[in-house]
């Protein structure tokens, strides 16, 4: 599942996540689009916030980055 879908399933906006984690909205957007990986210190808080496992967050983040790499390489 994509990070954006996980966030939306949790009923959260990017702004909500940014505020809870004390990061910029652009950081959350970049994570979801695969522009930047999620720093390890945010994996557990994101998982708790979204109500999923850390493994699911890592998998979604990796998939976003792989998709981005595929687009950039095309």
Regions inferred by a protein language model and the residue ranges of each:
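Short basic helix-loop element that most often maps to the first helix and adjoining turn
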Residues: 1-20, 45, 71-73
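Acidic-residue sensor for enzyme active/binding pockets
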Residues: 14-15, 32, 54-56
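DNA major-groove recognition helix of helix-turn-helix/homeodomain DNA-binding modules
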Residues: 22, 41-56
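Recognition helix of helix-turn-helix/homeodomain-like DNA-binding domains
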Residues: 23-38
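Short, charged recognition helix plus adjacent turn
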Residues: 30, 48, 56-74
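Short, solvent-exposed alpha-helical "recognition" segments
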Residues: 37-41, 67-68
